[in-house]
Regions:
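Short acidic-aromatic loop segments in the C-terminal HATPase_c
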Residues: 81, 131-132
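C-terminal "cap" of GNAT-fold acetyltransferases
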Residues: 71-75, 109-123, 127-129, 135-155
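Short glycine-rich hinge loops at helix-strand junctions in the catalytic core
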Residues: 90, 107, 130
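Active-site acidic-Proline motif in GNAT/NAT acetyltransferases
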Residues: 83-85, 89, 117-118
């Protein structure tokens, strides 16, 4: 999980950020200690997409206090990460559908996420799935404060 996390994050964000800020973020958020902490949180859930024996993507969702911004009766999609060579094969959509099924089973009111304002591909993906922007929040990548668009999908 550490390798796919770092690889997909670099592929998506390295072009718009400094090497120093990328390194700082990767070390803070994708260290083995941090990932173990996330996996052990009872309100966070991980689901993996495989092609043959290779993990090619994963989903991380949060409920309750595990959400990066606590929302009542909601499920946060924190990560839908798919390796570049497997994008466009409906893996991201399948992972999203898993998140939606979880939220519906738990009878939650909405699903939400934050997406970097400079990631038009992701914004278009979530808009096509029915998400609408409802707020913004700051996201720190290294020493750079960036803006995430918060998007939600009512259930």
């Amino acid at each position: 999980m550490q390798q796919i996390s770092k690889t997909t994050f670099i592929d998506t964000y390295a072009g718009g950020n400094t090497q120093e800020n990328m390194h700082a973020y990767l070390e803070a958020h994708f260290s083995l200690a941090q990932l173990k902490k996330e996996i052990s949180n009872p309100e966070s859930f991980f689901y993996f997409a495989r092609h043959k024996t290779q993990v090619v993507g994963y989903l991380k969702v949060n409920m309750g206090q595990a959400q990066s911004e606590t929302q009542k009766a909601a499920l946060e999609i924190e990560r839908i990460y798919v390796l570049k060579n497997f994008q466009g094969q409906h893996i991201g959509k399948t992972l999203f559908q898993k998140a939606l099924a979880i939220a519906q089973k738990k009878q939650l009111q909405f699903v939400w996420l934050g997406v970097w304002e400079n990631n038009p591909k992701a914004i278009a993906f979530y808009t096509a799935l029915g998400f609408i922007p409802y707020d913004k929040h700051l996201f720190k990548l290294g020493d750079d404060l960036q803006t995430d668009i918060m998007m939600r999908l009512e259930l």
